[in-house]
Amino acid sequence: MHLEFSEQDLQFRNEVRAWIAEAFDPELRAMMAQSKNGYLDKAGQVRWQKALHARGWAAPNWPEAYGGPGWTPTQRHIFQSELAAAGCPPVSPMGLKMVAPVIMKYGTAAQKARFLPPILKSDVWWCQGYSEPNSGSDLASLQLRADLATDGDGAHYVLNGSKIWTTHAQWADWMFCLVRTSRDARRQEGISFVLLDMRTPGITVVALPTLDGPVPGQQEVNQVFFDNVRVPVENRIGEEGMGWTYAKYLLEFERGGTYGPTLSKQLAKVAAIAADQPGDDGRRLLEDAGFRRKLAQLHLRAAGLQAVELKLFSGVESGKSIGAASSMLKLLGTEAMQAISELAVEAAGPAALPFVQDTWAEIQGREASPRVGPDYAAVLAPRYFNYRKASIYGGSNEIQRNIIAKLMLGL
């Protein structure tokens, strides 16, 4: 395992830093400062991702054959670390990080030619159709029906049912979706993986309110209803009934990632808040030994996680697969995210309590009262509530513990 960067790696890091300093302009920085979930609205995301694409850096994990930069795992880690350290928005993962690898591995030549170029350019927005009202962690129980039919338009599936917790479905042009094409086989064997145009007749998207409040431009989750929605058979990825295999492959990309640098950036913000807040005795909160101990413990968790990430990426560079370790990264990373958001609210104290007041006032038809406290505190409560879901999406952390126990510990 090599934890020290080579001279070439350090030169690459400087190149990335110089580009970020120019491309991540004050307007984007201000938008990110008020983001409750770490992403921009659609217009902001598209603008950022097209800037990355213009530099050739929109898809660091893609092979060169499909338009990727051809980086080593270490370069990819450096790139993601520098973006996180600068507070840049991550790319929306649904297209570039999730469905694209599935299309590359299991799609036909025609599907690759049709879907991959617009994904790379961020010309087409994707959402994920996995969870259902009665199928979350037990995803194999999904029931969205896809009945095969043939008429003058050729062979197609007719979809009836719904998906839920569908992130940014209101923005999406396309959805990658798990559907049930058979009820006779084992649950996992009756699932297929299809791509569907969100403009198809019969699709209805309904926004779901969440605890973090109605922040303009930051609506996240939706329920999507399908009423006799026709999906051409040629939009199925791979073989019928093999969707579960493709979904498991995709989840490796959803669960894995670079958490350490992002957590360190969040902790630096917490320290800045604490340095600005007086404690009960009039001293700055950062001077309080108890608070500093909590902050130090989280710094150690972030540093430990980053060391694990570097070890895993070093293995990837030697030809090893991350495999079930992606569950470990997801578990440790999301729990640390939640703990940091809790400490940020604690640091800001009463200033963190009012949130999205202007929006609530507008909904209620009244004038907004002045917000108490510094500007940075306005987003702390929405972010705290938003991060409660981090231990659930992508497979709940309870499921991740089961995977770790079975595949890594042999229990």
For the regions a protein language model found, what residue spans apply to each?
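A short, Trp-centered hydrophobic/proline-enriched beta-strand micro-motif
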Residues: 122-130
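Glycine-rich beta->alpha junctions and the first turn(s) of the following alpha-helix
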Residues: 3-5, 204-305, 390, 406
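Loop-to-helix element that buttresses phosphate recognition and phosphoryl-transfer chemistry
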Residues: 272, 293-318, 334-347
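A structural signal for short hydrophobic beta-strand segments in well-ordered beta-sheet cores
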Residues: 144-148
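Alpha-helix capping/hinge segments and adjacent helical runs
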Residues: 22, 57, 69, 327-411
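A short core secondary-structure module
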Residues: 143, 155-206
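Internal helix-loop-helix
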Residues: 46-123, 168-174, 302, 316-324, ...
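Glycine-rich phosphate/pyrophosphate-binding beta-alpha loops
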Residues: 135-136, 164-169, 389-396
